Structure formats: structure tokens, C-alpha cells
Amino acid sequence: MAIVQTLPVPLEPAPEAATAQQAPAMGSVSSLISGRPCPGGPAPPRHHGPPGPTFFRQQDGLLRGGYEAQEPLCPAVPPRKAVPGTNFTYINEDFRTESPPSPSSDLEDAREQRARNAHLRGPPPKLIPVSGKLEKNMEKIVIRPTAFKPVLPKPRGVPSLPSFLGPRATGPSGSQGSLTQLFGGPASSSSSSSSSAADKPLILSGWASGCPSGTLSDSGRNSLSSLPTYSTGGAEPATNSPGGHLPSHGPGRGALPGPARGAPTGPSHSDSGRSSSSKSTGSLGGRLAGGLLGSGPRASPDSSSCGERSPPPPPPPPPPSDEALLHCVLEGKLRDREAELQQLRDSLDESEVTMCQVYEERQRHWPREREALREDGVARAQRAQQLLQLQVFQLQQEKRQLQDDFAQLLQEREQLERRCAAFEREQRELGPRLEETKWEVCQKSGEISLLKQQLKESQSELVQKGSELVALRVALREARAALRVSEGRARGLQEAARTRELELEACSQELQRHRQEAERLREKAGQLDSEAAGLREPPVPPATADPFLLAESDEAKAQRAAAGVGGSLRAQVERLRAELQRERRQGEEQRDSFEGERLAWQAEKEQVIRYQKQLQHNYIQMYRRNRQLEQELQQLSLELEARELADLGLAEPAPCICLEEITATEI
């Protein structure tokens, strides 16, 4: 049975590795990790050069081995912050470039590996080394033992070594270049200037010392034991490398510094069944990047991790050859891998011990837990059975109730269908009546509009009649005023006639008195006539002058005086007769004038009475017509209200009884 083990990942850097670069956290060591490159950054293009027996993979974007443009299978590792007091910096982001997928890469294998390794992303899970108890609320990322290892894809080809030693080289073909071109500078011959030749070992040594270790490979086919040493007689990297950049870690060796003591130099993945040195190959990208950014002297990782101050660097020696540099780099990587393998062995032993303890504790707890689970399951089964029986009983009752409800609903449905059929028949029967009613409503609406128009006309006529009535009232007031004036004049005439009657009576009395007096005078005149006739005798006319008068006696004189008195009486009677005739004429004239005035007053009175009667008759006719119009208007309003109530379906109100009141005035 395979055991999954994990390496302890410190949250803070170790004291002895304070100045060393922090490598990404190492994941769980199992056979599920493939040898594909991590998404630290795209790999530079492959440069064709002298083939080597092995290849390197770039982790942070500088070097890549095996497959060039595979999709990443693990999340990108963020760059670590530089520790204060050191001059090491990462330049991984500067050299991260996009590279097109290689035709030799297998995308299907990458997808399968990504699907299998989806649960291994992120930091490694934490195991609880406490015996007897495990966390119950474990997250999805739980370590589980596995007895099988997936078949990992094999690298399609072995790339050349110069393709891992620098960024993308520019040239005519884009894939060929020397080692100096891979380091970023132009290609130069052995006769180049001494300054540029002196800077190359510094850059290479700084690059080799500053880069973190890469990922481990997935097979033992490319082990470090098969790597050639590339040792030549004329190359001495120990003497040519500067002391500040290539410190020696062994007797007589000055290749490259190894990993910092006490802390892992980078993420490593190993299988629980494999511990050979053929598991890992180095990545030179991050280690070479540390020397590209710094041009001055800087402390080595070993000296900075141990707390020692590096001496000032000596003047740069002449540049070594490419084979010597490659030899130094490979020896340094070999030492790094040996230290990593030792650390992996230690962590594997610790993880195996912890996992064995946890497994034994869980084996001891499993019977008790199984018994408790069995009892709990039996109790739950009994409760579930009782609950199910209760639910079955309730469901049976609900079923019977639903059957009763269904039968009742069927009956109601039949009743509703019958009512619906009756409603449809009524609707079909009421259709023609509805049309007739609509036509009647249209006709009545036309009549109503006509009646409204007539009502408006009658209202206008009523207003006109009202104005005429006002004018008639004004005329009536004027006629009454004239009548009062006429009555006053009539009263004055009556008083004048009365006075005239009184005067006439007085005149008639005086006339009667005059008549009586005239009768008396006539009688007296008759007597006097008779006396005068008796006394009148024809006298003897004298022949001469009237000597008789002279000689008459006194008696003759008396007779002659009496005859003179009779003549005066006659004259007075005639005068009185003339006055009587005149008085008679005046009385007749006054009687005629009084009679004419009486006739005129009577005619005026009859005219006023006739005018008042006509005015009263007109007023009564106007009043009756107004009452008739009001009754018609009220009847129309009642009909409209009755129609509205009939449309609304309400009962008609009782008709109101209108009493006509006629008031007549007496003249």
C-alpha cells in the first residue's frame, strides 16, 4: 500500500537561510506529478547546438527542458521579495516570453495530466500529527493514500543544452546561437575586447548563484549520472571564477555554490517509491537571473545565509571557455540535487512515520466508530420506519380525502357544465334581443339627443319668454301707474261732476224759484194786463196840442203813471225771460259737457279694465306654458333617470305628483 507523504513547508525563512532566495512551496510528493513545466513563464525558443546526453527544465521562465510549449499544470509561483541586506533579485519576469507550442508536444497528454493533477494545485495540505483525532471538516484538498501510479507521458525529444542557458536569441534562423548570444549579448570571437570577455564569467557566475532550483523530472531516464563532465585539459573553472561569485564548497573545487543550508531551495516533487538522484534535473533560469541584474560585487548565497560578509571581489580574470562554464554549472547543479535528495529523504521518513501513526490510530478507532455508526443506523432505521408508517397512514387518509374531494369536484364540474350549457343557450337566445336592445338604445340615444336639443331650444325660448315677461311686467307697472293716474283723474272728474251736479241742483232750484217768480210775475202781469185793459180805453185824440194834458185831472195823471209802470214791468219780464233762456242754454251746455266727460271717463275706465283683463290673461297663459314646460322637462329627466337605472339594473323610483297652482287676481 502506497503512502502519500508531504514535506514540511516553513512559513518563515530559517535563520541560516535569511539571505537566500525563498523558493516556492513544495507540493505533495506522489506519482501524480508529471514532468511538465510549471506556469512560471513561457520558455524561450529552442536553440540548436551540440546535443547533450541530458536536458534541463526551466521553472520560472528562463530555462525549459523536454516539452517547449505545454500548457501549465500548476499555478504560477509569485516571485519572492528580496531579503534586506542582500543584492539578489529575480529577473524571471524580464525573461518571460510567450513561446508557440512545439509540434512535438502532446496536448492530449497535457490535458489528461491537468485533469489528474487538478487537486494538487496550491500549497501542500497539512496533516495533523495528533494521534486519535482527525479534523472532521476537512476541505476538499485531503491527502488520501493511493496504490497506483498514473502512467506519465515521456518526453518526445532531448533538447540541446544551450537552449536552457539564456533567453530568446535573435538570429537569421531564430533557433541557433552560441552561449554568449544566449546570455543576452551579441556573438563574439575569441579576439573580442577584454572588458566584454571579463564580464561574461561574472554574469554567468551570478546567474548560476542567484537562480533557484527547478522542478524535478518525472522519470529516471535522464539521471544526473549520465551527464558528461565536459572536462578539458585547458579549462579550470575553480581558478578562473571570482571568489565573490563562485565560492568553493569542496577541496580543490570552485564550481558553483550549492543550495542554502537549512531551507529548501525550490519546489521539489518526488515519488514515495523513488529516491534516486535520477528524479531531478536542474533549472538554471532563476539562478542565472540573479547575476544579470547586478553588475557590482555581491555576496554569495552561502556566505549571506551563514551571516558572513564576503570580501571585495578581485579584478575579473580572463573569461573561461564555454565548456568550463558548463562544467561548473553542472557540478553546482549536481550538488544542489544531492542536497535536495537528502532533504527529500528526511521529509519522506518523517511523513511515513506520521502517516503510520495516524493510520494506526484510525485503525484503533474504526471498530468503535463502526459500532456506534451501526447502532445509530439501527436507531435511525427504526425511527425512519415509524416515520414512514406514520407518513403512510397520513398519506392514506389524504388519499381518501382527495378521493372524496375529487368526487365532489366531479359533481361540481357536472353542475358547472350544465350551468355553462344553460348560459350558452341563454346567450344564444339573448343575442337577437341584445341586438334589438342595442338598436333601441341607439334610437333612444338619438331621441335623447333630439330632446336635449329641444330642451336647449325650450330653455332659450324660456329665457326669451322670461325677458318678455319682464318687459310685460314693466309694461304692467307702467299701465298700473297710468291706471292710477287715470283713476285719480276719474276721481277728480267725479268730484267735478258732483260739484256740477250740486251746482246744477242749485241752478234747478233757482230756476224753479225763477219759474215760480215768473209765474207769480206772470200772474201779476195778467192782473196788470187785465187792469190795463180795463183802464185802457181809446182816448179822444185832441185836435190841437194836448191841452187836455194840461187840463187833465189828477186822475188822468195817475192813470198815465200806472201805464208807464206796466210798460216797465213788461220790459222787466222780457228781460227775465231772456235771462231764463240764457240760463237754460247754459244748463243744457253744462249738462252736455258733463255727459261728454262722463262718457269719456266711462270709455277710459272700460279700456283700462279691458287692458287689465288682457294682461292678466296673458300672464295666466305664460304661467301655464311655463308650468307645462317644467312638467315636460321633469318628465324627460325622469325618463332619462329611469333609463339609466334600467341600464344599471336598479329599481325605478316612484313618480312624483306635480300640483299646478293658479292664482288669479281680482280687479
Swiss-Prot record:
GO BP terms: microtubule severing; mitotic cytokinesis; negative regulation of canonical Wnt signaling pathway; nuclear export; spindle midzone assembly; Wnt signaling pathway
GO cellular component: centrosome; cytoplasm; microtubule; midbody
Biased composition regions of type Low complexity, renumbered to the chain: 1-25, 187-198, 241-282
Residue ranges of the region described as Required for centrosomal localization: 1-333
Renumbered ranges of motif Nuclear export signal: 629-638
Compositionally skewed regions (Polar residues) per UniProt: 172-181, 212-232
Compositionally biased tracts (Basic and acidic residues): 516-526
Modified residues (Phosphoserine): 248, 295, 568
Subcellular localization(s) per the UniProt record: Cytoplasm; Cytoplasm, Cytoskeleton, Microtubule organizing center, Centrosome
Region (Disordered): 1-132, 150-325, 516-541
Biased composition (Gly residues): 283-294
Coiled coil: 329-647
Keywords, alphabetical: Cell cycle, Cell division, Coiled coil, Cytoplasm, Cytoskeleton, Microtubule, Mitosis, Phosphoprotein, Wnt signaling pathway
Region (Sufficient for interaction with CTNNB1): 445-667
Region: Sufficient for interaction with KATNB1 and for inhibition of katanin-mediated microtubule severing, residue numbers: 448-667
Biased segments, Pro residues type: 310-321
Job of this protein: Negative regulator of katanin-mediated microtubule severing and release from the centrosome. Required for central spindle formation and the completion of cytokinesis. May negatively regulate axonal outgrowth by preventing the formation of microtubule bundles that are necessary for transport within the elongating axon. Negative regulator of the Wnt signaling pathway. Represses beta-catenin-mediated transcriptional activation by promoting the nuclear exclusion of beta-catenin.
Family: Belongs to the LZTS2 family.
HAMAP family: LZTS2
Self-association and partners: Interacts with KATNB1. Also interacts with CTNNB1, gamma-tubulin and KIF23.
Protein name: Leucine zipper putative tumor suppressor 2
Naturally occurring in which organism (per UniProt): Bos taurus (Bovine)
Organism ancestry: Eukaryota, Metazoa, Chordata, Craniata, Vertebrata
Gene (UniProt): LZTS2
